[in-house]
Regions:
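P-loop NTPase motor core
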Residues: 25, 100-173, 177, 330-416, ...
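Flexible loop/N-cap segments at domain edges
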Residues: 241, 247-267, 272, 280, ...
Length: 483
């Protein structure tokens, strides 16, 4: 099946290579959704003097306004105007005639210019003129039959509502339907598109985010796990965390390519632990990326220096990169594409995500996707033998609710480290235990976790404790336990 590339970043991936040649496709959406931008971007990226694009406007607005609109974007090419990209306005005549006469007018323009790509914006204006659904259906059949015979790919742009998909006859006749949306969630607006229909062609289903910038539209495909597991050979190699005493709790380190969740209350040491994991990996020659949503690179670098790491040298040698994104403006699909791109460019073997809770803000338009996103992200790391560490905040200090189960993050991670506060001898100390190490040995001991700028991080002695040590206030003398 021959295709016409859209040349819109990542859209051709969703369309399995582009728009099928000689097909007729509707681009639908509410005003402001980005339909006209998308149509123009496709036109200017494909048009040549031999393969012309004809853009027919039905808006009865001056063509100069249409052209000024296109000039706002980087894809506009003045050299193509008039000989490769041709504009025609039938808006004024549209008010004088019926839908059938307008179809004839479009066909006359197509015969005159012989385009390879035809865009009618807005096509819905023609449907509004039709005296009956049956008459409009016949006119569409006539238009599509003619365009198919002359090998012309057609984009029909219209301000359709979602319910029109089931009411308007054109949707059942055309070969493809691409629906664009722009909706507000809280104080943010989210743009997305999805393929409703693509006759005789595969495509990536679901809702895909996109943004509009000076460059035009960029699409961020919905990040999912492949339907069939990728074939890869799991590693048996153990990699060091570099934290004194922690590797021993895992029987010599964590397994390469696995994911480790570090969960704990605020200040328990999650970020410091994750940073040590990454920087100690750099000491061993493993490149890594720190993906942060709370601590910016300046703060992380300060923490690293306080613990004696030569972070300037490590970064200058390309061993570690910090990638900070504000959770307020986060879109998870856009973000993971950037993370994967940075991983590939650095050839990273370790990744830290601090913290997974902040990713929920990026899933605001679809909270059900949060779990699916985390799962897909971890699987991607695993498929590429990237050892990852994720952090998650627990809200209850000294309280219960230790483990996130079911569809929680701990269900996805291979290893789980729990950091808690305990009270011993009138002091608040930190406790660490390994709750889980999938498919391998781990200690079940509860140990003191020492964080010191002089000593670094260290897993200390066993904590003498009652069996409720991790869920209640703990004292050195179990007889003094207060529940």
């Amino acid at each position: 099946l021959e295709r016409i590339p859209t040349n819109v970043p990542n859209l051709d991936y969703i369309l399995s290579g582009g728009i099928p040649r000689s097909s007729v496709m509707i681009i639908s959406g509410a005003p402001g959704a980005g339909k006209t931008v998308l149509a123009h971007q496709i036109a200017y990226s494909n048009a040549t003097p031999d393969e012309r694009a004809l853009i027919i406007s039905t808006t009865s607005e001056p063509m100069s306004k249409f052209i000024r609109f296109a000039q706002e974007f980087a894809f506009f090419d003045m050299d193509k105007l008039g000989n490769a990209v041709i504009y025609e306005d039938i808006g004024a005549r549209l008010l004088e005639g019926d839908g059938g006469r307008m179809i004839d007018l479009i066909l006359d323009l197509v015969r005159r210019h012989e385009p390879s790509l035809l865009i009618v914006d807005s096509f819905k204006a023609l449907s509004d003129l039709a005296s009956s659904r049956e008459q409009f259906r016949r006119n569409i059949y006539r238009l599509i039959g003619f365009l198919s015979a002359i090998d012309c790919t057609t984009l029909l742009v219209g301000e359709y509502e979602h319910d029109d998909l089931h009411r308007s006859p054109e949707f059942s006749i055309v070969d493809g339907i691409l629906e664009l949306n722009n909706r507000f969630v809280g104080l943010r607006n989210y743009r997305s598109l999805r393929v409703i229909k693509m006759r005789g062609s595969d495509y990536v289903p679901g809702e895909h985010a996109f943004k509009i910038t000076y460059e035009g539209i960029t699409v961020f495909p919905r990040f999912v796990t492949p339907p069939k597991p990728l074939r890869y050979t799991p590693s048996e190699e153990k990699v060091t965390t570099g934290i004194a005493g922690l590797d021993e709790l895992f029987g010599g380190g964590v397994t390469k390519g696995t994911s480790t969740l570090v969960a704990g209350e605020p200040g328990a040491g999650k970020t410091v632990t994750a940073l040590h994991f990454l920087l100690n990996g750099a000491k061993a020659g493993e490149r890594g990326i720190y993906v942060s949503f709370q601590e910016d690179p300046n703060q992380l670098e300060r923490i690293a220096r306080n613990f004696g790491f030569d972070i300037d040298r490590i970064e200058s040698e390309g061993l570690v990169r910090m990638f900070y994104t504000s959770p307020v403006e986060l879109d998870i699909d856009e973000h993971i594409l950037e993370v994967i791109d940075r991983i590939e460019r650095l050839e990273a073997e370790r990744v830290v995500v601090d913290s997974v809770g902040d990713l929920e803000a990026g899933a605001a338009r679809d909270h059900d996707r949060y779990f699916n996103y985390i799962y897909s992200m971890v699987q991607h790391f695993k498929n590429n033998l990237i050892t990852s560490m994720l952090t998650a905040e627990m809200s209850e200090m000294f309280g219960s609710g230790l483990i996130m189960t079911g569809r929680g993050v701990s269900h996805i991670a291979d290893n789980v480290i729990l950091l808690r506060y305990v009270e011993m001898d009138s002091r608040v100390k930190r406790a660490l235990t390994v709750l889980k190490a999938r498919g391998s040995y781990h200690s079940d001991e509860i140990r003191e976790y020492v964080i010191s700028e002089k000593e670094g991080l260290r897993v200390g002695d066993l904590i003498p404790t009652h069996r409720y040590a991790l869920s209640n206030l703990v004292f050195a003398d179990p007889g003094r336990m207060e529940v």
